[in-house]
């Protein structure tokens, strides 16, 4: 997908990887970048607008844990203004295994609800034009960081959900792919806790692991968007962008 002249919604587009990716998107010249985030960051919004004044950057407050009806109401407002939306990026996430229910609510349920809501506008069975979804998951969705099993499981759930969305594309007209960053230098990694405090030094230990910068990760994120490959499972690790070949161990046969 050429980003130029497209309308893009980015959920949590002001965080570490999210903000740098938003910068990369704006440089590529979309028509509109709509950022939905829990906390407004006027300085970041101003920076995005300054990068490319031709791009309309808009912010709406959004908490992914709100009821589905509220998400649909917000999207109704956005679609009424833009008429069409080409890409939804689901990027909300927390890493806090002390907060089990909140982790699942933000990392998985909120993403599913946002996706479900936009289907009202995109699903070709309802006369919609289709669209594309990029879900930010994690390499922990492939192989868990076992000291943070709740976070890892929530990301594995999103990888699975996204793969199902991709297979449903012939029915819905909506393609999907997953973005799976490796360990990246963000506040998410530098300060968090393990489940039941099984490893108090987990953040410190991960900090010793080979990492990448948010700039490296975001550059590859933009490349994945431009590739627009339905069903792709992208690994963004150590400054590289690689497609993961998923091993099938079972098939429902339907």
Curated annotation (Swiss-Prot):
Gene Ontology MF annotations: alcohol dehydrogenase (NAD+) activity
Residues given in the record as NAD(+) binding sites: 10-33
EC number per UniProt: 1.1.1.1
Gene Ontology cellular component annotations, sorted alphabetically: cytoplasm
Active site, per annotation: 151
SUPFAM superfamilies: NAD(P)-binding Rossmann-fold domains
Quaternary assembly: Homodimer.
Binding site for substrate: 138
Protein name: Alcohol dehydrogenase
PROSITE patterns per the UniProt record, alphabetical: ADH_SHORT (PS00061)
Kinase in keyword set: no
Keywords: NAD, Oxidoreductase
Reactions catalysed: a primary alcohol + NAD(+) = an aldehyde + NADH + H(+); a secondary alcohol + NAD(+) = a ketone + NADH + H(+)
Example of a GO biological process term: alcohol metabolic process
Pfam families with a match to the protein in the record: adh_short (PF00106)
Protein family membership: Belongs to the short-chain dehydrogenases/reductases (SDR) family.
